[in-house]
């Protein structure tokens, strides 16, 4: 009986499932690390990590958000030792203004919640990738933000060579998908809803050899690469050059509104100053002619009445004489 009790306490420390979370954004979002524990030696609380991601999303600084679920992924697949398996992802980390790597999170991140949070806060729509194919992301040219949900196939557990090959292929798939996007402003959130099994490691060992237990320690924990500076805005702020909306109801109503003529529009009056002046003079002339004509009419009526009165007076005098 004591043996079973002992095993019940020991087994959770022998094998455990902790989710890695890697965040990279083209644009700078300040203060993300204030939401989480600064040390990665202990597992992070999923609530604090979710709050950090909400802070990242709330600014809506990206035009596309890639929510990537890699079943079977562990932090061991993302260490500096495995950098050759992720050539594109690492290259993107070098270019990103915001990078956060959390090797161990207590529970999986709720990607469905994040998807809905992006949709409601950034007026986005979702594109799903379920079959490891970039063709599932159709070309688009409008300015609406996108949530790209990528559910990758599980990584091999038994065969190390197959696992390495699968990771490399998935890295290339991410590259191909990003190349299809019309904007370079995007955010990657890589995690696992079904993480692989890892062995617990003593805290002192993590502190002594962080490169073996951190996500790409040579980039993320390098002060030169992970400073809170905008790497992609060194010269001046330039908004992405979006293609115009094609065959869109929004565009129709916007153009219709532009075509509306408002009487009290200052620009309209300024643009048509000569025409308006001419019309005003013509209307004023017609008005003056009408007034003059009216006064002439009144004058004639008055003269006629006076003549009629004078005639009546003459007739009355003649009758008296008779």
UniProtKB/Swiss-Prot annotation:
Encoding gene, per UniProt annotation: BIG1
Post-translational modification: N-glycosylated.
Signal peptide: 1-16
Lumenal side: 17-274
UniProt superkingdom: Eukaryota
Cytoplasmic domain ranges by topology: 296-322
Entry-linked PANTHER family: PROTEIN BIG1
Keyword rRNA processing among record annotations: no
Note: Present with 3460 molecules/cell in log phase SD medium.
Transmembrane regions: 275-295
Glycan attachment residues as annotated in the record: 45
Biological role stated in the UniProt entry: Required for normal beta-1,6-glucan synthesis, for hyphal morphogenesis, adhesion and virulence.
Keywords noted in UniProt: Cell wall biogenesis/degradation, Endoplasmic reticulum, Glycoprotein, Membrane, Signal, Transmembrane, Transmembrane helix
Protein name per the record: Protein BIG1
Principal place of residence: endoplasmic reticulum
Species, as recorded: Candida albicans (strain SC5314 / ATCC MYA-2876)
Entry's Gene Ontology cellular component terms: endoplasmic reticulum; endoplasmic reticulum membrane; membrane; plasma membrane
Topology of the protein relative to the lipid bilayer: Single-pass type I membrane protein
Cellular location(s): Endoplasmic reticulum membrane
Family: Belongs to the BIG1 family.
GO biological process per UniProt: (1->6)-beta-D-glucan biosynthetic process; adhesion of symbiont to host; cell wall organization; cellular response to starvation; filamentous growth; filamentous growth of a population of unicellular organisms in response to starvation; fungal-type cell wall biogenesis
